[in-house]
């Protein structure tokens, strides 16, 4: 495990050789920068949802309906004309990078605002606000809505905003949550629901973990956690856990996939770390127990990060259930520490995250399944980008055991953003620009 790696895809196919990990940094890699920019400038619009809200008077969230104020507008049937006009309103200059695409036969739209709108703002919300405003104006103009009914159209698109901070009950949705929901500085790219990531990747576990790793590590860069010596530390984790560097993740999963356990994954990780000279025996106790030392601490952390994800793929894959991801994060690292005498992934922060995660995801509290958590959540934000990729992988492998399914929370996001190749297959995208 040198700082020059080979990048492999989710099928173990070599994509790019002799890659300097520094070229994988969000500050340098063009594909990662494109993913981040497209994340900020893109929103999904549920045209079928708008049509249903207008017809029923149901808007602004659950339990809210204004009887007698329905509008029978054929929104889906006019999707082409709506898309054309929305593009004219959203674009800054003729022929710029504005993009408006019909999805699912006109039931949804993907609106990508031009980069100039994002650059001209202090945050990323202009994609949502401009997109929602353009759709609202287009519908009112197209159907000749009078001032009396205009608020109904606005509420069908925008939901209960501005009475609520977010567009609750609205039909315009981005990958990112609103900035007001962030737990601290630089958390925007980490405030993405695991279900969203799994939906975008079409439930491909390794691509889900890769996309999540890109978001998480980019967030660490944004919050100042990858400065100086910590940059190498984070990039090694991104390369090996997120981008299958040297095919290590794929090989360990393949080795343990048939009848492996968390314990056998630990054996695979420790053996490879010893063979690569990353760790070596420091001293031997009278009992014969070996205490190891890390000859390269960030590389040992990368090994632990790969192992944590591999154990998740093996364990959650065997059960086809996401619920055991929290216990996998916990006990893989707990046993790894006992096996080596070295800290687990992220120096105990993944293990610590898993303790609270177990309680809040399905223990006696049990308020939500793993898929609704993110790297901004008060329970799961504590790891520096190494826990949530495992959660996204587990959710992708889930066969329908979650209380909050991918389809119920992230159907629109998956349909719209999953149509963008760089989101759906991020490993290939990153390797493709090297």
Swiss-Prot record:
Binding annotation for coenzyme B: 367
Cell compartments where the protein resides: Cytoplasm
GO biological process, one term: methanogenesis
N-terminal signal peptide: none
GO cellular component: a single term: cytoplasm
Catalytic reaction list: coenzyme B + methyl-coenzyme M = methane + coenzyme M-coenzyme B heterodisulfide
Keyword Cell inner membrane: no
Pathway recorded for this protein: One-carbon metabolism; methyl-coenzyme M reduction; methane from methyl-coenzyme M: step 1/1
InterPro entries, sorted: Me_CoM_Rdtase_asu/bsu_C (IPR008924), Me_CoM_Rdtase_asu_N_sub2 (IPR015823), Me_CoM_Rdtase_bsu (IPR003179), Me_CoM_Rdtase_bsu_C (IPR022679), Me_CoM_Rdtase_bsu_N (IPR022680), Me_CoM_Rdtase_Fd-like_fold (IPR009024)
Purpose of the protein: Component of the methyl-coenzyme M reductase (MCR) I that catalyzes the reductive cleavage of methyl-coenzyme M (CoM-S-CH3 or 2-(methylthio)ethanesulfonate) using coenzyme B (CoB or 7-mercaptoheptanoylthreonine phosphate) as reductant which results in the production of methane and the mixed heterodisulfide of CoB and CoM (CoM-S-S-CoB). This is the final step in methanogenesis.
Entry similarity comment: Belongs to the methyl-coenzyme M reductase beta subunit family.
Protein name stated in the entry: Methyl-coenzyme M reductase subunit beta
